[in-house]
Amino acid sequence: MHRRRLLEAAAALPLVALAPALAAAPQPAPMRRVRPGEPGWPSAAEWRKLDEAVGGTLLEVRSLFSACESDPQGSGCRDAFANIQNPFYIGDQPGGTQVSGWLNAWTPAPSAYAIKARNSADVAAGVSFARERRLRLAIKGGGHSYQGTSSAADSLLIWTRAMNQVTLHDAFVPTGCDGKVPPAPAVSTGAGAMWIDLYDAVTTRAGRYVQGGGCTSVGVAGLVQSGGFGSFSKGFGSAAAGLLEAEVVTAAGRVRIANACSEPDLYWALKGGGGGSFAVVTRLTLRTYDLPEFFGAAWGKLRARSEAAFRRLLTRFFEFYAASLFNPHWGEQVTIGPDYTFEISMVSQGMDPKQAGEVWQPFFDWIHAASHDFTVTDKPGAGARPARHWWDIAGSHSLIPDRRAGAPAHHAWWDGDQEQVGAFLHGYDSLWLPATLLEAAERPRLIEALLAGSRQQEIGLHFNKGLAGAPPGAITAALDTATNPAATRAFALAIMASGEGPLYPGMGRAPADEATAHADARAVDQASAPLRGIVPEAGSYVSESNYFNARWQQAFWGTNYPRLRAIKDRYDPDGLFLVHHGVGSEDWSADGFTRLA
């Protein structure tokens, strides 16, 4: 026997001898959370004690249409159907989710109980109760997650909707930052506020601006933690970059202040590291900005009569975009459809009506000159209005007011967002497109990929969700967040999505036509494939992403993921805070009840 083989055989002997002992050694059972009816589930007395600790705010949670299951003709069922198109009504229900599910992904399922938290003490009591009793914990403010992250069956829900107070500051200094961080105008808000609450207080009433989301009923806390882009992000950056301070409750049940001077790692993770993963946010303070005199818009829709004409249209548009729109003034989107349709739905900041019109006139003139190639279905135009009235319901033709008795007078949603309310998703995907694709030599690759993809499914290019072209300060601030740095190099976020109207459990509607729904889901994948061909390692926006993305860590956070994981392990080593494809979720079963690693 060769010496090497002899040594290998000798080295193996102790292992062989130990094998029976190792095989017989008992393995620790994986950590499992408890469900109702299982040993360890809290007794009625324990739930009553929790209710007392949180001031009587503990609720049993019902699904949105539970009243219809017990009494299809009753007032509760009629009320649910009458209001299901109202995003504020949905958000006001503890069991409500802004989308009604996702094909083969998730279905809304109510928590067992919810704490309608009034303050951080209520939240801390709920967090400690869940930790000590091995309960699945869910957190909901706005409930807007496409991924269903605020919906978890058999869980205890921390519901922050009632924590919606808004306070303005002329010169805010984060706690412990005196002499280190200069005072700044800011707004503080409870975690349950929606962006319309801040826009009303900051812009309509006070004449300043806060960077938030485009959809008015999105929760403030969730958007900031996801990174957060709004219509005017090309000018002001991400919502996360505007976070000055957060009050949170950690997995240990402690109330902490996170800012640049106190808990700086946690503060950084909260800026785009994903909601529901690091702590329960109870209050946020965001920077406010000088309000431009004008906000504006550009619009129009046309259809090319041939693929050749459509290619010429896209070629001309991207030439025009690169030269005239790739700057802090212009955001929102254009949509490229499978039937050679091209729709403009863009917004501007800092340009008066004359300036906005002059920017677009060369492109509109080109369309007019090539009218034999196109059918115009919505006449193109551009304009602007005083920015202070952008979110003011009075005189608005685009905002739908919440007409329920007792609803805040400023609550309204954009009519263009109506189809998202209660949507049941068949498929969804997004990817950031780097600004290098706008260079003259690269544009043909971009155009061919868009042509190929749009044959399968409509593609929206959301220019405000890519920060390339934004002011340098906005990009620098975004790079100091946990958001994938690819966002700062992208001129747009491409979004492909399909779905149908509400399919909440208990509605009594026929289930989705599975053949059609699966075909739609495949079309989304087929539409994104050509774009991934030119951006093979593309990043994706965590809030608007593919539920089934296998490389989610890299796609959502890029090079920031290892740091986020280390912060997660430090502040929540036992994985109390858990959401689908959230930091650390790879250690858990899909339902969040069994620890795998």
PLM region spans:
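Soluble FAD-dependent oxygen oxidases
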Residues: 2-18, 22-597
